[in-house]
Amino acid sequence: MKIRPLHDRVIVKRKEVEAKSAGGIVLTGSAAGKSTRGEILAVGNGRIMENGEVKPLDVKVGDIVIFNDGYGVKSEKIDNEDVLIMSESDILAIVEA
């Protein structure tokens, strides 16, 4: 996939969530709900500050993140793959191993 986000935007591939019901049945897909975790596929150059300087992003390609799946998150299909385009500010945390 060749895509380069601009400024403070990132491209995220949502990670599938596996959930279990109270009875122990594994729920997948829409029954499990949408995951708010994903892997960073691409990052922009950084946030342009008021003084014109560019502040590099805190996330990098390959990071697993927890994000806010809100109004500013755009869903796109690129090369038959569902991805999310969001600002770095929509990312709440980086999951560290």
UniProtKB/Swiss-Prot annotation:
- Residue ranges of the TM segments: none
* Gene3D superfamilies noted in UniProt: GroES chaperonin
A GO molecular function term, named singly, is: protein-folding chaperone binding
Entry's Gene Ontology BP terms: chaperone cofactor-dependent protein refolding
Q: What is its main location?
A: cytoplasm
Q: Does the keyword Zinc apply?
A: no
Q: Does the keyword Cytoplasm apply?
A: yes
Highest taxon of the lineage: Bacteria
**What's a GO cellular component annotated to this UniProt protein?**
cytoplasm
Compartments where located: Cytoplasm
Q: Which UniProt keywords apply?
A: Chaperone, Cytoplasm
Q: Using the record, list the residue span of the signal peptide; answer none if the entry has no such feature.
A: none
Assembly and interaction partners: Heptamer of 7 subunits arranged in a ring. Interacts with the chaperonin GroEL.
Q: What does this protein do?
A: Together with the chaperonin GroEL, plays an essential role in assisting protein folding. The GroEL-GroES system forms a nano-cage that allows encapsulation of the non-native substrate proteins and provides a physical environment optimized to promote and accelerate protein folding. GroES binds to the apical surface of the GroEL ring, thereby capping the opening of the GroEL channel.
Classification via NCBIfam families: PRK00364.1-1 (NF001526), PRK00364.1-2 (NF001527), PRK00364.2-2 (NF001531)
The record's similarity note reads: Belongs to the GroES chaperonin family.
Q: What is this protein called?
A: Co-chaperonin GroES
**Source organism:** Proteus mirabilis (strain HI4320)
